[in-house]
């Protein structure tokens, strides 16, 4: 056994932290620079969940887990339950005795219960398998152990409905508490005549920022604000100021029965500031940004012919047999596009902003994250498919086609399996609706069907298949060759017949951890500490100390108990014990942010749940710089006696 000095132990424990925080810093910087937008973050996150993480899981489990490791898998599952249970207990005690807002009663339990048990420990282990403490083989086995922990996390948060703790914090408006469009438009500020004296470039960037913000809100505001309760729906008059903030134009959902409403918290914005001075400057070409071909999506139409041509094109897309349900929107569009809007209106209101142009705008914040991840409106109903808003009739027809691929893409099961924060209580209640009536009468049927649905998640399926392969030696021999696998006929290159699949999963899965840490940094870069609930900082600080300073002590004691019970030993299972120990010192899962955002209506101006989550998470990562190296140094020198 290799012996190391105290200085070596400290350096070995600190070095992985440096690498991890450098990668997190890259993601933080990319978010601040506008390179990694919230849309890009979600896309990459879904790629990690559906491709990269399943590939990594399959590769590491098949290559490093054998049939004799069944006992280790059981110990990991038991340890995971103890970690989750201890965190839940500490969070409950803190909630009981310290000031916590009632709107975050469930969120604090989830925050204390579920750690970030995927990217962080894997990155830490892969930095310690250089031979001084652990070999590369031990490091790979440690990664496989972490993936078993991750599987337990997925089962608890998704299959068993742990996300319901977060969802239970939210109470939504009803028809009586909602505010109508006519009420909200009264509070909209008029455009002052003094704005004509403002500097051109300042107005330009102000318009850019407004368009950038309204890219997320305008379509939702119009579509959710407009509905029909019949052919004679009472439609309050919409003012010019309200129609100016509609971008792009949208078609309402005919299935909506809601009255014309607009959320309470929506701030009225005027997305297009068309003044006489701007028109004259645009005509003279005196705008310095236009003359320099700056990155912008605002293209002023200086001639009435081009403007009218674009409007005629949009109207030509409407069919003559358009149903009555679209009449309200049609009226609004024509009012906005005809005499009520200036002829040199910016067509940026009708076009999305290019991602490269967003980099010139202010950094995205937590509100943009909410708008991207939110799955509910102010009433708690599932938000409409935004891809159908603003689409012409040809696009709607193609989207609603009954092709097999389109059916798969739009299925609820696909939505659940390909993203991490798209499930809700409604998905549990509607599970099993296609089953026979005699099966649906049992109260546990929806829960069982929902549990089985979540087992189809790519990562869960990869782990199930990988463990099945790993525990059957002759099947494992098709993928890898080890000392315990039987000899079978090899491929022409003297490798196992299915070794190419291991090459594929190993190559693709290697990108999982770096991407995960970059996304973590980008998410942290958008968090902001707002106006906290009075005294909440005491509860947050106390729970963070309990999680990252007290719980690691329990982890060390648990490892010692496992050895004394004879379940494991320090010679053969030291990597397993090391993984168990550091798992007690991990910060809260970042998925808590995405789940909280998914249950937050995008119109909310002061989301107290997001403010609590932000403050709670931002406390933990600075503390981990000290707590995790301290735990590792102690474990290496005292427990492992290196």
Curated annotation (Swiss-Prot):
Extracellular side of membrane: 37-42, 95-104, 164-460, 521-538, 596-614
Family designation: Belongs to the auxin efflux carrier (TC 2.A.69) family.
GO cellular-component term (any): endoplasmic reticulum
Membrane topology: Multi-pass membrane protein
Pfam families in the cross-refs: Mem_trans
Keyword Nucleotide-binding: no
Protein name: Uncharacterized transporter YNL095C
Keywords recorded for this protein, A-Z: Membrane, Transmembrane, Transmembrane helix, Transport
Biological processes annotated in GO: transmembrane transport
Positions of transmembrane segments: 16-36, 43-63, 74-94, 105-125, 143-163, 461-481, 500-520, 539-559, 575-595, 615-635
InterPro entries on file: Ecm3-like, Mem_transp_PIN-like
Protein's cellular compartments: Membrane
Record topological domains on the Cytoplasmic side: 1-15, 64-73, 126-142, 482-499, 560-574, 636-642
């Amino acid at each position: 056994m290799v012996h190391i000095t105290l200085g070596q132990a400290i350096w070995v424990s600190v070095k992985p932290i440096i690498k991890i925080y450098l990668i997190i810093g890259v993601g933080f910087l990319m978010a601040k620079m506008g390179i990694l937008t919230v849309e890009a973050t979600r896309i990459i996150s879904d790629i990690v969940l559906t491709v990269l993480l399943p590939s990594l899981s399959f590769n590491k489990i098949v290559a490093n887990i054998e049939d004799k490791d069944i006992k280790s898998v059981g110990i990991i599952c038991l340890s995971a339950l103890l970690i989750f249970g201890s965190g839940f207990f500490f969070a409950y005690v803190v909630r009981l005795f310290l000031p916590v807002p009632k709107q975050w009663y469930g969120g604090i339990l989830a925050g204390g219960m579920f750690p970030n048990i995927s990217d962080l420990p894997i990155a830490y282990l892969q930095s310690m398998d250089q031979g001084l403490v652990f070999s590369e083989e031990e490091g790979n086995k440690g990664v496989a152990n972490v993936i078993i922990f991750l599987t337990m996390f997925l089962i608890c948060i998704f299959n068993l409905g742990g996300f319901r703790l977060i969802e239970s914090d939210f109470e939504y408006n009803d028809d009586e508490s909602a505010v109508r469009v006519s009420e909200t438009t009264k509070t909209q500020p008029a455009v002052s005549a003094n704005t004509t004296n403002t500097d051109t470039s300042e107005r330009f960037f102000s318009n850019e920022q407004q368009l950038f913000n309204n890219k997320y809100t305008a379509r939702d505001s119009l579509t959710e604000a407009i509905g029909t309760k019949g052919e004679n729906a009472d439609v309050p008059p919409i003012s010019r100021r309200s129609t100016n903030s509609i971008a792009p134009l949208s078609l309402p959902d005919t299935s909506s029965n809601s009255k014309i409403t607009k959320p309470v918290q929506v701030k009225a914005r005027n997305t297009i500031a068309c003044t006489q001075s701007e028109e004259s400057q645009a005509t003279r070409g005196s705008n310095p940004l236009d003359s320099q071909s700056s990155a912008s999506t605002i293209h002023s139409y200086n001639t009435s012919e081009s403007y009218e041509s674009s409007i005629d094109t949009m109207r030509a897309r409407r069919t003559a047999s358009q149903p009555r349900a679209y009449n309200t929107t049609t009226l609004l569009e024509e009012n906005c596009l005809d005499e009520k809007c200036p002829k040199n209106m910016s067509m940026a209101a009708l076009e999305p902003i290019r991602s490269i142009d967003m980099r010139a705008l202010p950094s995205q914040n937590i509100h943009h994250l909410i708008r991207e991840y939110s799955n509910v409106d102010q009433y708690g109903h599932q938000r409409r498919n935004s891809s159908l808003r603003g689409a012409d009739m040809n696009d709607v027809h193609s989207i609603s086609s009954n092709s097999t691929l389109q059916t798969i893409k739009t299925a609820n099961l696909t939505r659940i399996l390909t993203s991490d924060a798209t499930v809700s209580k409604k998905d549990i209640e509607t599970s099993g609706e296609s089953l026979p009536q005699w099966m649906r009468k049992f109260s546990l049927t929806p829960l069982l069907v929902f549990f089985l649905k979540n087992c189809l998640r790519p990562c869960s399926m990869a782990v199930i298949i990988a463990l099945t392969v790993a525990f059957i030696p002759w099947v494992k021999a098709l993928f890898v060759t080890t000392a315990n696998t039987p000899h079978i006929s090899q491929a022409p290159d003297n490798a196992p017949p299915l070794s190419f699949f291991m090459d594929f999963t190993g190559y693709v899965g290697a990108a999982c951890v770096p991407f995960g840490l970059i996304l973590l940094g980008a998410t942290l870069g958008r968090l902001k500490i707002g106006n906290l609930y009075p005294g909440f900082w005491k509860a947050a600080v106390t729970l963070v100390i309990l999680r990252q300073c007290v719980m690691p002590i329990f982890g060390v004691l648990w490892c010692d108990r496992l050895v004394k019970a004879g379940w494991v030993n320090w010679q053969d299972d030291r990597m397993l014990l090391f993984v168990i120990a550091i798992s007690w010192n991990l910060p809260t899962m970042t998925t808590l942010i995405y789940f909280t955002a998914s249950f937050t209506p995008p119109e909310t101006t002061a989301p107290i749940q997001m403010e609590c989550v932000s403050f709670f998470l931002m406390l933990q990562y600075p503390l981990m710089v000290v707590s995790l190296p301290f735990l590792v140094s102690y474990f290496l020198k005292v427990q492992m006696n290196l």
